[in-house]
Regions:
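N-terminal active-site wall of soluble small-molecule enzyme domains
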Residues: 1-58, 169
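Active-site loop/helix belt of alpha/beta enzymes
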Residues: 3-6, 10-11, 15, 83, ...
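Short, acidic/turn-prone active-site loops that include or flank metal/cofactor-
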Residues: 24-26, 44-49, 66-68, 89, ...
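Active-site-adjacent beta->alpha loops and helix N-cap segments on the catalytic face
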Residues: 25-30, 67-81, 130-140
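Short catalytic-loop micro-motif centered on adjacent basic/acidic residues
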Residues: 40-42, 61-63, 158-160
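A generic, well-ordered mixed alpha/beta core segment in the N-terminal half of proteins
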Residues: 56-93
Length: 187
């Protein structure tokens, strides 16, 4: 919606935004060209065909499969860099992510890819299936992260709890403290 408009990007940066995320690589290119120095996140899982431009313009990518991760790892190798990924876990919305009972397996596979950094886990609610974010859904994500930590030995520091639909949960004080990122800004 904002299409990486420079004035809006500056307003976000001046207001304390610590990262800019977008679902379109072209907009992330504009973010980079704006020179804010903020890390960027690609919200749409990249296809193997656009993995190279995803790695070039985004610091982080949300992914839902080992196949996407493999494509990003190859692209990062070709670019001579590391790329950070957030593995999405579907805790009920039926839109994106690996099932909780497969998360350890998928995260373990991804952790072996040489040119990726596994930043953490995320989820998306109140989108396709209309599942409302709750403290219980967030705790489910926290539990999956703990299982993945134990299996891989990785910190998985980033725990992205969802989008703007999570704001009521945050405002009510019911958001678990382990959730340290929300992707705010619905279209």
């Amino acid at each position: 919606v904002m299409q990486a408009h420079p004035a809006l990007l500056r307003a976000f940066a001046d207001s304390g935004a610590v990262m800019i995320a977008d679902s379109r690589v072209d907009n992330l290119r504009r973010v980079s060209e704006a020179g804010l120095g903020l890390p960027t996140m690609l919200l749409r899982a990249p296809t193997p065909r656009n993995a190279a431009e995803s790695v070039y313009w985004a610091d982080y990518s949300l992914i839902s499969s080992a196949e996407s991760a493999t494509a990003l790892s190859h692209a990062a190798a070709s670019a001579g860099r590391r790329h950070s990924v957030v593995v999405m876990v579907d805790v009920g919305d039926l839109r994106e992510g690996v099932w909780p009972d497969r998360a350890v397996e998928v995260v373990t596979q991804i952790s072996r890819l040489p040119h990726l950094g596994l930043a953490g886990l995320g989820t998306n609610l109140a989108c396709y299936g209309g599942v409302i974010p709750t403290a219980e859904k967030m705790r489910q994500l926290i539990d999956v992260r703990q299982q993945c930590r134990e299996a891989t030995g990785l910190p998985l520091d980033l725990l992205s709890g969802g989008n703007s639909a999570n704001l009521p949960l945050l405002a009510s004080g019911q958001m678990p403290s382990e959730i340290n990122q929300l992707r705010i800004g619905e279209a």
